[in-house]
Amino acid sequence: MAKKRVIRCLIIILTIVLAGVEMFWLSRRKTIKQYKESQAAFGNPLMGYVPSAWYNEVSEDISLLYMDITWAELEPEEGVYNWASIDEENQISRWRKEGKHLVLRFVCDIPSDEEHMDIPEWLYEKSGEAGRWYDGEDGKGFAPDYNNPTIISCHRKAVRAIGEHFGQDGLISYVELGSLGHWGEWHVNYSEGIQRIPREAVRDKYILPWTEAFPDAM
């Protein structure tokens, strides 16, 4: 019994010694770096603030860029998509070659200084001019009626087309749930008489097409 106790103690001591030796060598291999405070922007892979895709100059460590597309520029005629202009403006070929990724937002209403629409003219007419023109503190523009069945149906087709064009090679890493509200931010200035963002059941009809078009994006 005493012999077993001695052996057990020796094993424990040996284990402690070996652990101490290992920790000693690991501490000697440790590298300590000191960084100076800086206000410069630096890359943070696939996260954080990102520059716009149309920027001509971005630092090499930037891996993610931002692209928004208005419905008016995407589909000037029903079923006809303006890919050549969109790809050129956002330098899609360049970013693919450089291995960059994009954040995408689809927008239907961007207030500005001038009266305008960010949905196509054909959709405005096809939906029975469903929505409201506004001129307020956010700017001027047209807020579509997102409850309109025609707009919902055509939105689904537009998103499917975007997925077919951009969703095949991992270029789009993130899809921002735009589509609804000013700047695609899911809010409107309803105090100016603009119809509120629709209820959840209708909102889902604007969300689900994106999950189908970009199943691998976040």
Predicted regions and their residues:
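Surface-exposed loop/turn and secondary-structure junction residues enriched for glycine/proline
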Residues: E77, Y174, W183-W186
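Membrane-interface motif at the C-terminal end of an N-terminal transmembrane signal
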Residues: G20-K33
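N-terminal Sec-pathway targeting helices
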Residues: M1-T15, L26
